[in-house]
Structures are given as C-alpha cells and as structure tokens.
Amino acid sequence: MNFSVLPPEINSALIFAGAGPEPMAAAATAWDGLAMELASAAASFGSVTSGLVGGAWQGASSSAMAAAAAPYAAWLAAAAVQAEQTAAQAAAMIAEFEAVKTAVVQPMLVAANRADLVSLVMSNLFGQNAPAIAAIEATYEQMWAADVSAMSAYHAGASAIASALSPFSKPLQNLAGLPAWLASGAPAAAMTAAAGIPALAGGPTAINLGIANVGGGNVGNANNGLANIGNANLGNYNFGSGNFGNSNIGSASLGNNNIGFGNLGSNNVGVGNLGNLNTGFANTGLGNFGFGNTGNNNIGIGLTGNNQIGIGGLNSGTGNFGLFNSGSGNVGFFNSGNGNFGIGNSGNFNTGGWNSGHGNTGFFNAGSFNTGMLDVGNANTGSLNTGSYNMGDFNPGSSNTGTFNTGNANTGFLNAGNINTGVFNIGHMNNGLFNTGDMNNGVFYRGVGQGSLQFSITTPDLTLPPLQIPGISVPAFSLPAITLPSLNIPAATTPANITVGAFSLPGLTLPSLNIPAATTPANITVGAFSLPGLTLPSLNIPAATTPANITVGAFSLPGLTLPSLNIPAATTPANITVGAFSLPGLTLPSLNIPAATTPANITVGAFSLPGLTLPSLNIPAATTPANITVSGFQLPPLSIPSVAIPPVTVPPITVGAFNLPPLQIPEVTIPQLTIPAGITIGGFSLPAIHTQPITVGQIGVGQFGLPSIGWDVFLSTPRITVPAFGIPFTLQFQTNVPALQPPGGGLSTFTNGALIFGEFDLPQLVVHPYTLTGPIVIGSFFLPAFNIPGIDVPAINVDGFTLPQITTPAITTPEFAIPPIGVGGFTLPQITTQEIITPELTINSIGVGGFTLPQITTPPITTPPLTIDPINLTGFTLPQITTPPITTPPLTIDPINLTGFTLPQITTPPITTPPLTIEPIGVGGFTTPPLTVPGIHLPSTTIGAFAIPGGPGYFNSSTAPSSGFFNSGAGGNSGFGNNGSGLSGWFNTNPAGLLGGSGYQNFGGLSSGFSNLGSGVSGFANRGILPFSVASVVSGFANIGTNLAGFFQGTTS
C-alpha cells in the first residue's frame, strides 16, 4: 500500500485505528526480558562448564566438552547483547509512532471537511458556493500534504530503525560425533537409501486437481501456490477460498495461520479480526478474545484498551448508534472501526458485516473499497477475489472481468495468461478458447499471431415489384398571428456602498548601483547648429455640450499612508574634476504672440460644489542629522562679461501720504578705553590709489511733491564724547576726487547737539591674512512638531453666468542676447551627508458629498497659427570631465497600505420596448398527383470481401497490443470498446497516466463494476468526486462522494 497516493481519510484512519504503541511496548519489554534471560543463561552455562572442568571431570573428554561448550556460551552472550539492542530499537519505534500520530490530521477533521464539501456541492445550484468549495478543497489538499509529510517522516524513521537491526547468528547446528546421515538433517532419506528403495527420477512432481491453477498440489480452481484446497487462493497450504497468505483455514483472510473468514492479520480464529492472535470476531488489536474489542489482550465484548476482562459500555466510541461499538461514528453492532454501517466491522467506512478492510460494501472483506464478499484485494466488484480491481469472482489476478482468472487484465473465465479475451487461455493477448500461444484469434492455437478472419458481402438475385403512390390531399391551414409583448427593462441601481477591500503594495527594493569610473574625451567640439522654426497649425475645437444633470454619488477617498523613507548616508566621490569650458553666446529671437480673443457667450449653467473637508495634517517633528560635513573647496575665477541692459521706461508712480511715528534713540555711553604704553608700530606706507573718474549720467526725475513732514517733538542729537588718543606716525597720501555736485534740495531747520572730538592717536593697524578652511561643521538643530488643524470649506453655490469676450493685444518681445560666459576649471569637494529617516506620513481620508454637474456649452474655438522663429546656437567645446567610481547603496521602499473605500451608487432609468405583432400566415389546400414506380431487378452481386490477419484482437487501435474488439488508448486491454491501459470488460475508460480497471462503462482508474465515475471505485453507478489521479474510495450502489460505502450515500432524494 503506497501511502503517498492515499487520501488523508485512509492515512489518518490507519494511524488512529491500529493497536497503537502498546504491542511495540510489549515487544520491547519482552526483548528486555529475553536479553536478561540470555545473559543469565550464558552466565549459568559458563559457570556449570567451568565447575565440571575444574571438578571431578578431568581428562580428554572434559577438554573436548569444554571446547564444544565455549562457542555456545559465546553465542548466548552475543544473543543477549543483540536482544538488548532490539529492545532499544523497539522503544525508538514507539517514539516514531507517537510522533506520526501527533503529526497526522485528526480523522474527525477530515470527515468534517468532506461533509462540508458535500453540503456545499449539493447546494451549489447557481455556482454561488464556488469560492467556499475552492477554500474547502484547498484545506483538504493541505490535510493531504500534512499526512503525506508525516507518513514520509515516519517511513524514513522506521526504515532507519529497521536497518539498524542486525540478524541473529545461528547457533551450532550439529554436535560432534553424530553419524553423517543424522548430522545431514535427512535421516529419512538416508534410511530409505539404506533400505534400497529407489527414488523417483526427475525430482518431486507437482499435480493440480482443478482448473486454472498455478503451482502444485492444489485442489480446486484458480489457485496460485502450493497445496491449496479451495478456489482463488494466493499462497500455500490454505483450506478454503479467496485467501491471501499461508496455512489459512476459511475464506478471504489476508495473512497467515488464520481460522475463519475475512481476517486481516495472522493467527486469528474467528471472523473479521484486524490484527494478530485474536479469537472471536471484529476485534482490532492483538491477543483479544471476544467480540468488537479494540486494544490488546482483552477478554469480553466491546472493550477499549489493554488487558481488560468484561463487557464494555454499550458503545465505547463516540457518535455511534447501536451496541458494543468501540470505534466512532458507527451504526450497528460490534464495530471496532470508524464510520461503519453493519455488524462486526474492524475497518473504517464499511457497509455490511465483518469487514476488516476500509470502504467496503459487503461481508468478510479483508481488502478495501470492495463491493461483494470475501475479497482480499482492493476495489473488486464480486466475491472471493484475492487480486484487485476485478469484476467477477475467484480472481487471483488483477483488473479481470470474469471468474477464475489467475492472470491480469483478462475478459472471460479461467484465463491463466494476461490480456486475454475468452476462456481457458494460458498464453497472452489471445481472443478465443484454449489458446496456449500468444496474440492468437481462435481456438486451440499454440503459436504466435495465428487465426485470421474473412468476410464477404453478397446480395441475392432480387426483383422489386412496381410501387403505386396515390395522390395525397393536404388540407388548407393557417398560422395564427403571433404577438410578442412589450419588454420592460426595469430601472437598475448598482448596490450602494460597493466596498473595495484594503490592499497593500509590497515593498520595493532597488539594488545597489555600481557606476564605474569614466572620463569623457578632452575637447569634444559641438559644431554650430540651428533649431528650425516651428509652426503650430491652427486648432479647431468644435462646439460641445455635456449631458444635463450627471449625478455622481457621494464617495470617500481612503486614507493613504506613505511609509517612512530611509535615505542612507551618502558620500560623493572625492575630487570630481571639471575642466574649464565656455558656453557660447545664445540669442533668443523675438517672440510674437498674436492677439487672441476668447469666443463670446460661453454659457456655464448653475451648479453647486459640495462641501469639501480637508482633514488635519500632522507634520511630525523633524531633526536634521548631526555633523553634516562639507569639506573645503575652491571656486575658480568667474568672468562675467558686460551685459547691455536696454532702456527701461518706468511709468509715473504716485506715493500716497504716510506718517512716521516718533523715534526715540536712548543715550549711548562708551566707557573709557585705556591702551597700555609701550606699544610700538613700525612705519609703513600706502601706495598711491588712483580712481578713474566716475561719470553719472543725467538723471531725470519727473516733478513730484512731498507732503509736509512734521515732528511731534524737537529732534536733537545726543552728546557724544570721545576720549583723547594719539597716532604715532604721519599719514600722507593724495587722491584726486573730482568735484561732486549734488542736485539742489532743501531741508527743514534742525539743531545738532554739541559734538566734541578729543585728541587721539591711531596705532599701527595690521590685518593678517585670514583663510577660511574646511571642514565647516553645522551642528544639529531640532524642528518641533506642529499640527495644522482641519479646514472646512463650506459648499459654494454659483449661479449660471456668461463669460464676456476678452481681447488681449499682440505682444512682441525684443531680442535678448546673452554673451558667452567663461568658467575656469574647478574641483568639487567630497560631501558627506548622514543617514536621514523620514517618519511615516499619513494623509487621512477625504470625503466628498454627492453633487450634480451642470450642462456646459462651449462654442467652436479656433486658434490662429503660432510660429516660433529659428534659434541659432554657435559651436562650443565640452571640457573633459572625470568622475571616480560611484556605488549607490540599496534603496528600500516599504509597502504602501491602502485601506478599503466605497464606490458611489449609479442609477439608470427603466426602459420599455413596444410590442411586436407578426400577422397570420395562411396556406390553401392542395393535392399531390399520383406516382408510379416501376419494378426493379437487382441481380446477385458481391459488394465486397475483406480478411483480417491473425493477431491480438479485432479492430483495435491502441498503441500497445490489445486483445478483444474495438479497444483504443495506450493498450494492454481486453474485452470490447475499452479506451486506456490495462482495462478489461466493456466500454471502460481510464485517463492518460492511469492503469487498470474492469467491468462495464466505468470512467476512471483502478475501478471495477458498472457505470462508475472516478478512481478507486467499485460497485454500481457510483461517483467519486476526487481528481482521477486520487482514489475516491467508494463502493456499493449509487453513492456520490469519497470514503463512502453502502447505498445512495451523498445523494438527494
């Protein structure tokens, strides 16, 4: 049994339905006891022999005894060690079983899943349960995967434990001094030879009494083995029918040394026992005596556990209906399995009695999902089948349709070969009877590919008499008028508040980017070029009117959360060198903007803008990173050529009257400053400074008037006192400053306060060179968080209005010339910025109330052509630019979450179509004329003849050879009209990749019976709902689903 293809119903049920770890624990205890006994025996044996040798027994015989006893003592000690190791491996196996029992899915969960699926499928009238069915199936697939994973781990662990066991070495077989004929182990043969009785030449002779037996000494039919008495036994020394094993007395037992019917195990006495050493019926476990016990070493009825005596509760399981059920979900009596209907079932999901397998409909079945009685194999429809997927009785082979077939995929009876269609065929792929060869069509063929079929079709001599057809009167008839009623399409409104669920955009990570060092070639020269003039043609926009009263329901835009953005620290590469370059002069031509006039009388209907609420915006506190370092750098000299500014005319400007408030300057006191004596300043001289004459052109100021200015209080300057100081040198220089003639003006009278300058000296003043070097460090600073409260903009109502015609005059801009600008070569310093992390920014949802768009009509609009004159650009040279390698760090954009939002409601008005009437159509009566067909003579002729050569079957189109008729598919079929591989029977089909099946009109793999759909199905008109690659485990009559047995399960009345 391959657990990887079994559904979780079987895998979980097998794990939970067995005897559990108790038998293995008992075995571990027994091995421990055996190890102790062997060690004690070895010590005792050694002690006895040592005592004998060291005591009164002396001499050569004593030495010989000691030498002969030593290997036995060593064997006993080694066997004790091996028994102890075996006990340890048994304990490890118990741990493995407990682990798999914990890992597999509980059977009740699997049953609940399947029940939910059936309920959803039966109520899925309009497909509304499709998502729920998909979810149930997905959960079931996960259960399947969990069970297969657990069983794989269990298989691996159990295999490792089993491989660690070492076989026990055999003790010495012979003792010294025995005669040769006795030491050889064949005393009877030796005595026979000594007596002179001759032996039969050629060895033993195997004689079978019956039909279609394979092996020797069998009495009955279709046995495969030795010394079986009965029918369809697969094994040796069985007495009964349908046994798979050895030395069984009874029928349909799977195992060895059983007495009874339908036992799955060994050494059982009774009916329907699952396990070993049970006496009674429907016991599950080891060493039970009674009925319906689950566990080990129980004596009684319906007991659950180990080593109990008595009668259990009416039902010791859960969900049972009946008496003495120790399993769960049973209906009946003495059921120790789960989900059974009947009496004494130790397997699961059976309907009937004393079934030790699973999913059977019938009695005494040791296999699984059979429909019938006493089946040892799987998916059989019939009785006493030791093979699998058979339709019929007494078949030791598999996928047969018929009876007493010991081969496979046969259609017929008593076939010992494979893929035969017929009776008593010993060879393979034969059509017919008693063929011992292969691929023959016919009877008693012994070769290969013999037997052909010839056909000829001949018509007899035939004369047809004349045929008189009288006239036929057809009465008048009229088709009534047909009126199609008017069709009313009611108003439709989309459901309100269609909600779009929240979704998240996943995070996006941009990998780091490596930009290698690059240097542009020096002195790239770009020749002068001109951009051609561009003319935009005139544009005609026709008149357009929007439909009136478009209604848009209120809707809300969901809140949008922008995740925090991490900008990693970045450092520009040091010493990026940019060579000197010159930008050529650029002349922008004058631009003519023609006069434009908007169309007159643009009408905008009245409309209302709904209230708009802007939610409050929280700008969290932000802190610039500390220690932003900008290294020192040097800007090259920059030459800015002269710029000619055209005359600018400023229109008259009028400044209104204004008042200056009173200005109060407080008294300022400078304390006395004392410079210590003894400071010496060396002499120095200033060179002559020549300033060229500065000419200020005539400035014309238009006539303007100033209003009277008044002071509220008298204005006087405060007293300023400067203490005396001295300058110990003479300062002489000359300057030529031309006379400056200020324009005329007048001031009102004011008074200066007393101004006194004391004697003072100016010391030598030295200003040392000062260089501002980098780095310049700007410390961190903190911006506190601030909140902007929500702003409510109330609804604005605008009545209809008409935009007047607006005319703008033509505008012409003069040419503007930018002379060339020269920049010397310079080096950009390295700049380092610390890592910056921006906090999350949340924009709350914005709600907009429903509103109606008015009807808007715009007249046709025509724009005049717009011409852009050519632009001339002189040639210039690009400098050489060198950039070092640049590597950008990865940039990660976190996921963006968008909450659900609601779509507005849209309404369409009702539509009614007018009725349609088709007028009546009338046809008048008429009579057909009589017709006479003269006699016809058809002479005898041969239409055709053909011959089918010998081969496997007739009219087969399968890829591989098949027997039978009209078979197709992969091949290896027998019977009639089968399509697939390994099929027998009539009109069966299995999908590509599946193998086997028998019966009539079945579709699926590994099935038998009549008109079944699905894989792993037997019986009549059953339907499995699992994929064809998975066994649905269905038997019985008219069942729909999986893990079903019985009648009409999973259907509606």
UniProtKB/Swiss-Prot annotation:
Pfam family, one: Pentapeptide_2
Superkingdom, natural source: Bacteria
GO term, biological process aspect, one: response to host immune response
Family: Belongs to the mycobacterial PPE family.
Extra information: Was identified as a high-confidence drug target.
Protein name, as recorded: Uncharacterized PPE family protein PPE24
Organism: Mycobacterium tuberculosis (strain ATCC 25618 / H37Rv)
